[in-house]
Amino acid sequence: MYLNLYEIKIPYRVKRLYYFNKENDPKEFARNLSRVNNIRFNDSKDLVWLEIPDIDFKITPQQAEKYKIEKNEIIGEKEDSDLFVKTIYRYIKKKFIDNNFYYKRGNNYISINDKFPLDSNTNVNAHLTYKIKLYKINERYYISVLPKFTFLSDKPALESPIKSTYLFNIKSGKTFPYISGLNGVLKIDLGENGIKEVLFPENYYFNFTSKEAEKFGFSKEIHNIYKEKIFSGYKKIKQSLYFLEDIININNYNLTMDKKIYVNIEYEFKKGISRNIKDVFKYSFYKNDQKIKIAFFFSSKKQIYEIQRSLKMLFQNKNSIFYQTIYEMGFSKVIFLREPKTNSSAFMYNPETFEISNKDFFENLEGNIMAIIILDKFLGNIDSLIQKFPENLILQPILKEKLEKIQPYIIKSYVYKMGNFIPECQPYVIRNLKDKNKTLYIGIDLSHDNYLKKSNLAISAVNNFGDIIYLNKYKNLELNEKMNLDIVEKEYIQILNEYYERNKNYPENIIVLRDGRYLEDIEIIKNILNIENIKYSLIEVNKSVNINSCEDLKEWIIKLSDNNFIYYPKTYFNQKGVEIKIIENNTDYNNEKILEQVYSLTRVVHPTPYVNYRLPYPLQVVNKVALTELEWKLYIPYMK
């Protein structure tokens, strides 16, 4: 089996070449050389210099070589690894631009020639694109080349009949929000620097995201392109990227079987064990026997009339999919709440303000109450609805049009989701984690809003059954790529207190999962974790992994080194890995046993029996909480 890794074959050194031109200003001289050679030249008061890999290299134009002076330097990778990595990236960028590729931020290279128009909209072209990333594995450097597609307008922005939210500048590689293109004048949004009229509009093309593909009706075709043509992107690497042969071995990285790990995930239900989560309908919830209370909320009597046939088929017919699923999952009884005065099972809400009738009635009720809210239209922002409904209700909004033609698997998913939100219910137990009841898993996400110049910190704690022990979020912190460790310490103490209150003792092991890298002082973090002398492990989780293969890796884990792994979750869409790096491990588990637990956390909770989470559950929780204000409450079963 092969991975898209190509070993760097040149010496791990950087060569610094110096140039002196007494007839030219150094800044201007450096700028001209950078433009002509497609690589950055630096300047000082009197000198210009270039940093390149330690290979034979001649600058353009040839006569400029006469300005080269004898002074040069060789800097080894061990002396300055950051310089070596930056230099490799810059040289790769030059080679791509020299060979008819656009550069796009994030080390993406868009083929100018390898493109084709979409069948569903010929004004949009799919360009074969390669994303490049360097990896250091067991002291050797590799370039990872990941094929993908970029969707650009066929013509420059001012000539394009189709427009999108963002413009891509083919010269700078940057994207900008599109403002207008009237009377031959193209305007873009520069954020804090305001709106600008561009000087060279021919350099700007519309860039279409997956969301815009939905808007314009070609999202299905994009999915098919990835499904049917991404394989050819891998096959073209050797032929298309021949120009990189001077620095890399263009043969793929051969993955030996001892580097492949398979974790057998088994679900234990009440009446059986299976590797398939869908067998929950066959074997019933691991723990249930709960009554389920349901309240229906409608926007108007007209709405009730329009969907009454669908409601009767679903909720009055005892042989319906709804009742069948209720009993399959082990619920003991269904109770439809009624309005106290009228005895009606229809409760009303205002579709404009989302105020509900009988709010006091619901606030005084105890137990698990599912609120099925029928919506007339899609709500772009559902926070207002969540704010107005009592906090003790478990909200299940559904569009009226979907209820009228609802599929059986959707009904089953709704019932399953209800069980997920009831604390007394346990759909299943992951057998790999069943004996880890004294281990606590903490997820941390630090996200940034560069426009507002603020950071948000979210932290969760989850046990081996997927129960959320603790969840909190800090909004609008001072923008910083590092976590505020005073907050982390305070939250850690809160988590331990919550755990102790539930279990009357502290956990024996804590595994801390960080979305991204630990940029903070690790020693301080270790001191925080040592408060109660609990054994711990620190793990970095990178969800933007470039390493992949044209072969099927789903449900496999790749061992890159003793502490570095990539797992490929089972998904219905494109194969994409998640990198796990174990930074610190002072638990009694070895690294592979830690990895097994982390991977099992992707299955410890399923949002529906038809969907897997891609990230370990503690991070899935904080990612959702960090990205939304209140909407996460519809998906994350945490009622505090």
From Swiss-Prot:
Segments for region (Mid domain): 292-423
Protein's UniProt keywords contain Manganese: yes
Region entry PAZ domain, spans: 154-209
Alphabetic keyword roster: DNA-binding, Endonuclease, Hydrolase, Manganese, Metal-binding, Nuclease, RNA-binding
Source domain of life: Bacteria
GO molecular function, a single term: DNA binding
Region (N-terminal domain): 1-100
Record function comment: A highly versatile argonaute that uses 5'-phospho- and 5'-OH- guide RNA (gRNA) or DNA (gDNA) to cleave target RNA or ssDNA (tDNA) in all possible combinations; has no detectable activity in the absence of guide. Uses short guide sequences (18-21 nucleotides (nt) on average) to bind complementary target nucleic acids resulting in target cleavage in a site-specific manner.
Protein name: Protein argonaute
Organism of origin: Marinitoga hydrogenitolerans (strain DSM 16785 / JCM 12826 / AT1271)
